[in-house]
């Protein structure tokens, strides 16, 4: 994939919304997170944690955000896996990201 250092999956798929075997182009943010749900069809929920600075208290607070992402057929993922998702065009009302890599050994 151009611009993102991820390896090509071994499995082949015929999903038109696959960034590897379909016609979906990725651009914008690349986010790492943990899969919290994979119950929906071809959709995963990824949770990421980040720190937000609070001026009044001069300290950081920990925040979480949940992002829905498209899961192509060529990538296998389960709850608890560490993944990398990339921004793409809007695929549904809530999906703007697509799964591009499953981290090994985590």
Curated annotation (Swiss-Prot):
Molecular functions (GO terms): rRNA binding; structural constituent of ribosome
UniProt-listed GO biological process terms: translation
Keyword RNA-binding: yes
Keywords on record: Ribonucleoprotein, Ribosomal protein, RNA-binding, rRNA-binding
InterPro entries according to UniProt: NA-bd_OB-fold, Ribosomal_uS17, Ribosomal_uS17_arc/euk, Ribosomal_uS17_archaeal
Lineage: superkingdom: Archaea
Pfam families assigned: Ribosomal_S17
SUPFAM superfamilies: Nucleic acid-binding proteins (SSF50249)
Quaternary structure and interacting proteins, as annotated: Part of the 30S ribosomal subunit.
Family: Belongs to the universal ribosomal protein uS17 family.
Protein name stated in the entry: Small ribosomal subunit protein uS17
Upper classification of the organism: Archaea, Methanobacteriati, Methanobacteriota, Methanomada group, Methanobacteria
Gene name of the encoded protein: rps17
